[in-house]
């Protein structure tokens, strides 16, 4: 699950989410998978918001229940509102998309 090849991003995410944040989300999934402490669910949910000069990224899944939050200092990323992104693994490929694109 969540192999490093065959990863896709929808046009909407690619246009609205900074590439650095996209790479951070993929890295968060890879880290969770590599550590092996938690079984990965096929659906990973990311919530992104800006707090001052920090970007806050919360990752969660339902089965088994898991969540963590990272704070990253990136000043030149513009986030006007909260962003919710799904990353879904189909077994053959993984795709990053907005909830409205599901």
Model-derived features with residue positions:
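Short, compact, well-ordered microdomains
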Residues: 63-102
């Amino acid at each position: 699950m969540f192999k490093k090849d065959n990863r896709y991003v929808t046009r909407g995410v690619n246009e609205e989410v900074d590439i650095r944040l996209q790479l951070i989300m993929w890295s968060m999934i890879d880290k969770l998978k590599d550590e092996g402490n938690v079984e990965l669910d096929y659906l990973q949910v990311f919530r992104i918001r800006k707090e001052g000069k920090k970007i806050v990224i919360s990752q969660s899944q339902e089965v088994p229940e898991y969540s963590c939050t990272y704070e990253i200092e990136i000043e030149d990323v513009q986030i006007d509102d909260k962003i919710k992104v799904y990353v879904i693994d189909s077994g053959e490929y993984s795709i990053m998309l907005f909830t409205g694109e599901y």
